[in-house]
């Protein structure tokens, strides 16, 4: 009987080891160094440019003649400067969209810039944008659509996989370090890709690149789509998610086009340009909820970002800078403890006592201050530890909450009606492990006007 019981125990332990959730705990999931660095970038830009730009299309069907692609004045440095003015620290170029048209001279197909009149068929737009990004201090990434509406090999999965592998080799080996590699699952229908080999091939060339994928491809993702193209995420946004039966660190990227209706440039579309107010809302509901904001920028048929778009990007960048220029905690506050969380330096952090499951960061002011925004940042190297928190002010002899939440993550911006107080605290009501707080900051939006 003892032997039988022991055997069953061994089998049970073996089965538990095979069951992913049994061995996993939310608090045990940590990001890679690359993910931590990526989350610090906060804002990115993605460029859509191709034959669709010249044909007033959004999704090309793969039938466009390459001769339509002939921009007379491509200025990749201008593209990058426009993105940088908005606060972007990385860019992604759509090297091949669903229509199959290649913005680099691929040796595997004639359907691309090498068959166009642009630069006599000798141009390489991927190289131009990559080099411009690096010149201007931005990181560079590539979008390579799995769906290809032009190439006949697409209807034969093994042949198309070889084609896709080859294009991946070209892009991953020629243009320097890639910060991000976008895989878009749109439109593929019943086509079956060998994604295991695709990722293996990518890692051979780019071991540190981060893979972005939408819902259908979460298994392969280091970064995840938020499920919309509005540039916003839910108020509670967790970096640790379960999409395939196991927990994994998958920070979110919230993408949205600068012109609300389209990703590619279209004539007479200026009216859909997002306002500064809308863009600030996107920022506070993406970056301000622990995600990245990815802005879609569409160069026109000249190969330039339209002037009105450039101005809007500049206005947005200026507006973010002004709204978050004056951290009242750093400028006017005095802490009782936790000074590393109040020093305005995201490179430092305050650690709650080991073993604690609740902690408080408190700040006092000599005179009452008025504020309507609280910014909190976790030190994510050790994981996302805060599970419940409140921002509180001391009023009429007791602490009163002005904001309550659960997830903090990389950055949480809580927005509330203006409040005036001399004592403010961040009450970390529930944590999984001792909290690690990089920053607790207070701002008044009125000061930016």
Where would I find each of the regions flagged by the language model?
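Short, conserved beta-strand segments of beta-strand-rich sandwich/propeller modules, principally
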Residues: 373, 423-425
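Bacterial N-terminal signal peptides
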Residues: 9-17
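Mature catalytic domains of secreted/periplasmic carbohydrate-active enzymes
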Residues: 23-343, 349-357, 362-364, 370, ...
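Short beta-strand-plus-loop segments that form exposed binding edges in beta-rich domains
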Residues: 427-433
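Short beta-strand elements bearing conserved aromatic residues within extracellular beta-rich modules
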Residues: 389-391
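Bacterial N-terminal signal peptides that target proteins for export
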Residues: 1-9
């Amino acid at each position: 009987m003892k032997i039988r019981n022991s055997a069953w125990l061994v089998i049970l332990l073996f089965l538990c080891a095979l069951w992913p959730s049994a061995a996993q705990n939310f608090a045990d999931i940590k990001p890679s160094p690359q993910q931590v660095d990526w989350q610090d970038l906060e804002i990115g830009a993605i460029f859509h440019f191709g034959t669709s730009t010249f044909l007033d299309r959004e999704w090309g069907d793969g039938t466009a003649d390459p001769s339509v692609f002939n921009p007379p004045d491509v200025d990749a440095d201008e593209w990058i400067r426009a993105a940088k003015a908005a606060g972007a620290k990385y860019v992604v170029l759509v090297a091949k969209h669903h229509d199959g048209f290649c913005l680099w001279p691929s040796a595997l197909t004639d359907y691309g810039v090498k068959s166009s009149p642009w630069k006599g068929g000798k141009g390489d737009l991927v190289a131009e944008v990559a080099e411009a990004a690096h010149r201007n201090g931005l990181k560079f990434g590539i979008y390579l659509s799995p769906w290809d509406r032009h190439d006949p090999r697409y209807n034969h999965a093994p042949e198309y996989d070889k084609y896709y592998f080859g294009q991946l080799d070209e892009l991953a080996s020629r243009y320097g370090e890639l910060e991000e590699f976008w895989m878009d699952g749109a439109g593929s229908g019943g086509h079956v890709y060998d994604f295991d080999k695709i990722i293996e091939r990518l890692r051979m060339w780019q071991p540190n690149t981060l893979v972005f994928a939408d819902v259908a491809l979460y298994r392969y993702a280091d970064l995840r789509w938020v499920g919309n193209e509005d540039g916003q995420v839910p108020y509670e946004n967790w970096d640790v998610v379960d999409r395939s039966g196991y927990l994994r660190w998958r920070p979110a990227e919230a993408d949205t086009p600068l012109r609300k209706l389209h990703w590619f440039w279209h004539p007479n579309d200026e009216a859909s340009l997002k306002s500064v107010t809308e863009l600030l809302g996107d920022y506070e509901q993406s970056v301000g909820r622990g995600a990245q904001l990815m802005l879609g920028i569409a160069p026109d048929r000249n190969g330039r970002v339209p002037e009105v778009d450039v101005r809007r990007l500049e206005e947005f960048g200026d507006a973010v800078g002004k709204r978050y220029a004056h951290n009242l905690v750093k400028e006017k506050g005095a802490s009782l403890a936790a000074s590393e969380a109040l020093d305005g330096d995201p490179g430092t952090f305050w650690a709650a006592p080991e073993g604690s499951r609740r902690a408080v960061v408190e700040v006092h002011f000599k005179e009452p201050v008025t504020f309507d925004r609280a910014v909190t940042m976790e030190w994510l190297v050790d994981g996302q530890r805060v599970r419940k928190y409140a921002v509180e002010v001391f009023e009429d002899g007791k602490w009163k909450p002005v904001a309550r939440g659960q997830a903090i993550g990389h950055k949480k911006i809580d927005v509330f009606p203006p409040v005036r107080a001399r004592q403010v605290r961040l009450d970390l009501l529930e944590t999984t492990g001792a909290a690690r707080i990089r920053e607790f900051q207070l701002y008044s939006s009125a000061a930016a006007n």
